[in-house]
Amino acid sequence: MIKWPWKAQEITQNEDWPWDDALAIPLLVNLTAQEQARLIALAERFLQQKRLVALQGFELDSLKSARIALIFCLPILELGIEWLDGFHEVLIYPAPFVVDDEWEDDIGLVHSQRVVQAGQSWQQGPIILNWLDIQDSFDASGFNLIIHEVAHKLDMRNGDRASGIPFIPLRDVAGWEHDLHAAMNNIQDEIDLVGESAASIDAYAATDPAECFAVLSEYFFSAPELFAPRFPALWQRFCQFYRQDPSQRLRVSAAEGDYGEESEH
């Protein structure tokens, strides 16, 4: 059990969100105009349904709130806003936060320790984030705290806790589990060879299936060029689940860029 020292400041609703400015981040640059319009519509509903709560003196404004909402809705762009119905609040610290974590061991003794967290998702509770890592989530780098925590929420729709297997048809579960564990083993092999800091995929993905799904969801949306060629079978499963193909978006965007450069000559 974690005790949260909340001192909160809730944002007020704003009907005039700066969507054009909010979209102007590398993570969202490859979306088509139609996808951007649908993402904005989802983000508007997100801001109507969820409370963004700033903690410990952090101040939210309309641009920050709009960008947070857009990133929350990117994974469910083709799934629908109801896939985010498992929580009502997003709590935002200014930086990674320290919490008191209490846990019970196998013989019933309760232990307490202070733990630094970047974010948290709970089955029946809010999503907790921090602004420093949210800012780092704007880039197309493979790191995205919001998508990571959203992936946990999507994962938990399939049961009481995150397992690494989201809500997919039963016939696909065995194949998903096989490919996910193969990816975990491959990532661990690279870590053993070059070390955690030099690994091309975040080492956290090798810790357990739930974290592997969440970490690879980050790469799926923000660095598909690192995910798709390395784990092609698992990539296709992610495409089927999310009903999106960020790698295809990247190819189309690159081709359009090349065409634009040729037209200038």
Swiss-Prot record:
Hydrolase among keywords: yes
Assigned EC number: 3.4.11.-
Residue ranges crossing the lipid bilayer per the database entry: none
Gene Ontology BP term (one): proteolysis
Cofactor: Zn(2+)
Keywords annotated in UniProt: Aminopeptidase, Cytoplasm, Hydrolase, Metal-binding, Metalloprotease, Protease, Zinc
Similarity comment: Belongs to the MtfA family.
Protein name: Mlc titration factor A
Organism this protein belongs to: Salmonella gallinarum (strain 287/91 / NCTC 13346)
Gene: mtfA
